[in-house]
């Protein structure tokens, strides 16, 4: 048994889980998410509002998908109850972010400002011109949007300028030695 896959998934009050064949739908106070479980894995509702994820055999692929499927469904439940937040910060002279409606406008040292539109289910919050956050109920989408924003200007290893995750440590490099 997979260490992660064998753990039951607790369904909190206020969350409605519907299993229709291979499709799992989760509705909660923050919204709803749907996921299709891969073929060999089965999900069943147990007593006491618990979901159990099982696999039919001990083949390598079944073992790999067991823990993954359980974690994806658990992340859906966490998303519709608490949501996910990815905080980012900008460092560098003249680098800043502005909220333009539901979108973000970045000044990152290029000759033009960069406009990032919020995908469906994602919201941006700007705390100050150098700190902002990406919020949503889908963990994968929140992480992907945050990574795409970070990619606009990756942190420079020499001066540590750019967009980075809050708390991310940038390994600094020593510059060229002068004569």
Curated annotation (Swiss-Prot):
The terms under GO molecular function for this entry are: rRNA binding; structural constituent of ribosome
Which Gene Ontology terms of cellular component type are present? cytosolic large ribosomal subunit
Please provide the Gene Ontology terms (biological process) for this protein. Answer: cytoplasmic translation
Q: Which residues form the signal peptide?
A: none
The UniProt keyword set, sorted, is: Ribonucleoprotein, Ribosomal protein, RNA-binding, rRNA-binding
**InterPro entries under this entry?**
Ribosomal_uL6-like, Ribosomal_uL6-like_a/b-dom_sf, Ribosomal_uL6_a/b-dom, Ribosomal_uL6_bac-type, Ribosomal_uL6_CS
Annotated HAMAP family:
Ribosomal_uL6_B
Role noted for this protein: This protein binds to the 23S rRNA, and is important in its secondary structure. It is located near the subunit interface in the base of the L7/L12 stalk, and near the tRNA binding site of the peptidyltransferase center.
Q: What is stated as this protein's family in its record?
A: Belongs to the universal ribosomal protein uL6 family.
Q: How does it assemble?
A: Part of the 50S ribosomal subunit.
Q: What is this protein called?
A: Large ribosomal subunit protein uL6
